[in-house]
Amino acid sequence: MSLEGVFNEGFMTTSYDSVVNWAKTGSLWPMTFGLACCAVEMMHAGAARYDMDRFGMLFRPSPRQSDLMIVAGTLCNKMGPALRKVYDQMSEPRWVLSMGSCANGGGYYHYSYSVVRGCDRIVPVDVYVPGCPPTAEALLYGIIQLQQKIRRTNTIARA
C-alpha cells in the first residue's frame, strides 16, 4: 500500500483507492476451471509446497463465492457457453487468468475443428500465463502480476 504522507506519530494518510485495492489483492478467491493437464499444475500450486494461502487465496467451488477464474486447459466449442455462463455468475469485480498455451490460443490443438482458439474469445482475460503446462511458479507469478494490476486500478470514478 502506498502511503502519501506520514504526519506526527502514528498518523498516516492514504487514498481510498489504495486501501480498497490493497484489500482486494489480499483476498483473491479463485475458482478452478480445470479442463486438461494444466489443472494438475494449478492443484500443485495450491498444495503445501507453494501454498497460495499466504497470498490470501482460498479456492472456492462456486462462482458466486469467487472473484478470480483460472482457466486451465483446452477449451472446446461445447464448453465455451458453460465458461461464459460461469463467468456471468461471478460477482463484480471479477478477473480471469488464462493458464497454459491451450487456454491462451488453442495450443497443440489450434487447428482442430472443436477447439476455441483462446478463451479470450469467450470471456475477457486479464493475465495470460504461458507454457505447456506452465509450472506452479509461473502460475504464482501470473497471480502476482494480477495483484499488481488490481493495485493500479481506480476504485472511484473521477469526473
Swiss-Prot record:
Belongs to the complex I 20 kDa subunit family. Coiled coil: none annotated. PANTHER family: NADH DEHYDROGENASE (PTHR11995), NADH DEHYDROGENASE [UBIQUINONE] IRON-SULFUR PROTEIN 7, MITOCHONDRIAL (PTHR11995:SF14). It is an enzyme of class 7 (translocase). It catalyses: a quinone + NADH + 5 H(+)(in) = a quinol + NAD(+) + 4 H(+)(out). GO terms for cellular component: plasma membrane; respiratory chain complex I. [4Fe-4S] cluster binds at C37, C38, C102, C132. Its main location: membrane. It holds the Pfam family Oxidored_q6. Binds 1 [4Fe-4S] cluster. NDH-1 shuttles electrons from NADH, via FMN and iron-sulfur (Fe-S) centers, to quinones in the respiratory chain. Couples the redox reaction to proton translocation (for every two electrons transferred, four hydrogen ions are translocated across the cytoplasmic membrane), and thus conserves the redox energy in a proton gradient. It comes from Polaromonas sp. (strain JS666 / ATCC BAA-500). Keywords: 4Fe-4S, Cell inner membrane, Cell membrane, Iron, Iron-sulfur, Membrane, Metal-binding, NAD, Quinone, Translocase, Transport, Ubiquinone. This is NADH-quinone oxidoreductase subunit B. Disulfide bonds: none annotated. Its cofactor is [4Fe-4S] cluster. NDH-1 is composed of 14 different subunits. Subunits NuoB, C, D, E, F, and G constitute the peripheral sector of the complex. It is found in: Cell inner membrane.
